[in-house]
Amino acid sequence: MKGKVKKFLVKIGAAVLLIVMIGGVVVSIKEKKESENAIHIVQNGKFNVNPDATFSQAIDQYLIETNWSSYTNNDGRIVQIIGKKRDANVDHTYTYELNYLVDRKNNTYTLYSAYKDGIKMNAVEELILKIKAFDLCDVDIKADEK
């Protein structure tokens, strides 16, 4: 009798473990899709400085080694862009971190935070960077051709 109970408990444990694993995979797939959707909202953003360009075209041409990612915090879904910009005048390469809070219902985003070499930028500094990126963007150049 003890052997049957033990086998039954092992089967129950295996079934519970399988359910937990499947649940984890489903959550992981959902998280990945939400992350990709949020990134696309920001990448497809437009700006009146150059209405033909998308945000990803402008930023990926203006900065080098750009990396787009997404995460969730208490405020919501954040899209993070990290990239570098060489300034020949001071012989320095700056690292920029741009974070945008995404409103998935309205397919919009707003500045969440921005940093230049780890120093917090204000909204005006981020806007200047965005204006320069869009102004210099050539919509006929793909990111891998820059």
What are these language model-derived features?
Residues 1-2:
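N-terminal hydrophobic targeting signals that begin at the initiator methionine
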Residues 11-25:
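Hydrophobic membrane-insertion alpha-helices, especially the h-region
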